[in-house]
């Protein structure tokens, strides 16, 4: 069955109404993000990213966080600079031992921690707004106004996107980067436009400067250009003329544009850093990742030629080493592994996606099969990259969250919308999408403001999330502030002992509580607040990172909670309060 093409006379007649509807939906999604982030404590990685953001934007050096590219942190950093934040204290020549650490920087700053993280998170919420709007506009081009509006509605209330739109991290930016790059490249292919190829290159460069996994976009864009070249050759042969090579010229233009954006981002972040200091930062980072000396030598050679390229190469090399050696302990449905699970992201997608979203995809797959929807370049551009991401995810040893698969959500949704509007009458397609979106909205509102801990009802909901997954899927440290408020409400702050996993500072939030120090601290009877992550894999993760004494302490805690602890309350879905009884003799 041939796909129906976009009819400008239908869709362009109401651009104001379309734009208003999409902007309102995107704004509603952002409102949910703002509402949950005002209550969320810093997640595990946020103090690191916030310190790095301030370093890049205010100090103009790049000693911290080489394992991530700088673009998102530059956005956060310039927002912090405008709000009056300071740069972290880092002496030159640089020494890791003397550098200010993330938690002291975050909680002993001119800005209160709530304001510091609120300002740093704001640019990520803006990226979420842009993702919703850009997805709606792209679908509108191919399927009309109604399809675009329903796409915006489904994305604006998708719980995983909402969760990570409120975190200083790179995952939401990767979702926007994948979608924008692929859609612009597909449009450039359709229209034979060098301008669109240049725009795709800018989007590609921004994606590469946002997250290292976006390097997977490079072969995808090259493949689209090859499709364009084959099409040009075929059309030129029919017409008896030489091919115009627009796709090849477009690919070269996109490559140049992406390089300018990528290395320009690094240049801004390290504008006050000398080449020797850049090389020193590269060596310190790669040694900390236990990279082979041969790898370090090659990256340092690149750094001597270009400090920007050297930092990018160091980040890629560090990720590669981590994937080979393991980045930590992974948890899946009761099992632990440092090597990862091939099925991890398939399970995570199944239990972390809303039932409404999954229903839309299932109906679209059924319609595509029974109506024999013919896949064109646009549909393949939207469907094959998610398949590629899932396949590459099977080989990774770093299984820490569905957040690494955020790019598949807008791509798969856009593909589903196109299939439904091509194969069904518009009212039937709209009914399917509206039903799925309303179901998803109900699921999201039911768990709000705990979107980070979302699990669908088929998996048992967030209360059963710990049986499936942990880490950034459930417990990333976001509920520490809520815990402090709960303890004060109960009148239990002074008698509570807190065993916490995350980026928050326990003495800041609960100054009268006792902080559990695993190495050597006894596990006494009383009221305990314990992070879910520590119960599932705290001892194993601590041992993996070279702290046997801490691992032994966490193992004692887990044993004590399992054998003589009674759950008396829960904070969000990531922290449980236990009444720990005396040990029977």
Residue ranges, per PLM feature:
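C-terminal luminal/periplasmic domains and tails of membrane-associated envelope-modifying transferases
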Residues: 7, 290, 294-301, 305, ...
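Signature aromatic-anchored transmembrane alpha helix within multi-pass, membrane-resident enzymes
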Residues: 20-25, 219-222, 251-260, 369-375, ...
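Transmembrane alpha-helix segments characteristic
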Residues: 26, 150-151, 361-365, 373-394, ...
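Interfacial juxtamembrane loops and adjacent helix segments
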Residues: 62-125, 276-339
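Transmembrane-helix motifs of polytopic, lipid-linked glycan transferases
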Residues: 122-142, 180-184, 369
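Short helix- or helix-capping micro-motifs
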Residues: 151-156, 183, 204, 208
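Membrane-interface transmembrane helices that cradle and orient dolichyl/undecaprenyl
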Residues: 181-197
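Hydrophobic, aromatic-rich transmembrane alpha-helices
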Residues: 348, 353-376, 431-434
């Amino acid at each position: 069955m041939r796909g129906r093409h976009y009819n400008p006379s239908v869709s362009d007649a109401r651009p104001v109404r379309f734009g208003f509807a999409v902007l309102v939906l995107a704004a509603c999604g952002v409102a949910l993000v703002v509402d949950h982030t005002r209550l969320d404590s810093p997640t595990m990685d946020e103090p690191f990213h916030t310190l790095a953001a301030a370093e890049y934007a205010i100090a103009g050096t790049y000693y911290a966080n080489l394992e991530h590219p700088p673009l998102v942190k530059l956005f956060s950093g310039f927002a912090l600079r405008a709000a009056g934040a300071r740069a972290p204290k880092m002496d030159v020549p640089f020494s890791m031992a003397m550098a200010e650490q993330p938690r002291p920087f975050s909680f002993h700053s001119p800005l209160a921690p709530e304001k510091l993280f609120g300002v740093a998170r704001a640019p990520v919420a803006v990226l979420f707004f842009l993702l919703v709007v850009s997805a709606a506009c792209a679908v509108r081009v191919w399927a009309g106004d109604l399809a675009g509006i329903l796409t915006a509605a489904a994305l604006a209330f998708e719980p995983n996107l909402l969760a990570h739109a409120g975190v200083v991290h790179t995952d939401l930016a990767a979702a926007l980067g994948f979608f924008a790059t692929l859609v612009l490249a597909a449009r450039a292919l359709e229209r034979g436009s060098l301008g669109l190829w240049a725009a795709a290159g800018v989007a590609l460069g921004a994606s590469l400067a946002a997250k290292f996994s976006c390097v997977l976009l490079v072969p995808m864009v090259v493949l689209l250009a090859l499709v364009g070249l084959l099409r040009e050759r075929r059309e030129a042969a029919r017409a008896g003329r030489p091919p115009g090579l627009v796709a090849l010229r477009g690919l070269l233009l996109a490559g140049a544009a992406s390089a300018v954006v990528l290395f320009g981002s690094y240049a801004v972040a390290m504008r006050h850093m000398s080449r020797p200091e850049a090389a020193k930062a590269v060596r310190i980072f790669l040694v900390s990742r236990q990279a082979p000396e041969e790898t370090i030598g090659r990256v340092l050679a690149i750094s001597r030629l270009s400090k920007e390229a050297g930092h990018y190469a160091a980040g890629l090399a560090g990720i590669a080493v981590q994937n080979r050696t393991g980045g930590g302990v992974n948890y899946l449905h009761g099992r632990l592994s440092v090597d990862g699970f091939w099925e991890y992201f398939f399970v995570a997608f199944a239990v972390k996606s809303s039932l409404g979203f999954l229903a839309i995809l299932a109906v679209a797959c059924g319609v595509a099969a029974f109506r024999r929807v013919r896949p064109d370049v646009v549909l393949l551009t939207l469907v094959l990259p998610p398949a590629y991401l899932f396949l590459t995810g099977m080989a990774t040893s770093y299984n820490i969250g569905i957040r690494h698969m955020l790019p598949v959500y807008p791509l798969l949704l856009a593909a589903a919308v196109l299939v439904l509007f091509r194969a069904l009458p518009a009212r039937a397609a709209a009914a399917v999408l509206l039903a799925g979106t309303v179901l998803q909205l109900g699921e999201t509102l039911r768990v709000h403001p705990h979107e980070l801990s979302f699990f669908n009802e088929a998996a048992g909901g967030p209360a059963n999330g710990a049986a499936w997954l942990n880490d950034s899927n459930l417990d990333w440290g976001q509920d520490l502030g809520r815990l402090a408020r709960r303890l004060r409400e109960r009148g239990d702050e002074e008698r509570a002992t807190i065993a916490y996993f995350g980026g928050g500072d326990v003495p800041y939030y609960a100054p009268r509580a006792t902080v559990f120090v695993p190495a050597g601290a006894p596990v006494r009877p009383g009221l305990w607040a314990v992070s879910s992550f520590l119960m599932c894999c705290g001892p194993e993760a601590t041992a993996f990172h070279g702290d046997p004494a801490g691992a032994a302490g966490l193992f004692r805690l887990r044993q004590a909670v399992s054998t003589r602890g009674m759950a008396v309350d829960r904070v969000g879905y990531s922290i449980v309060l236990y009444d720990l009884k005396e040990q029977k003799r």
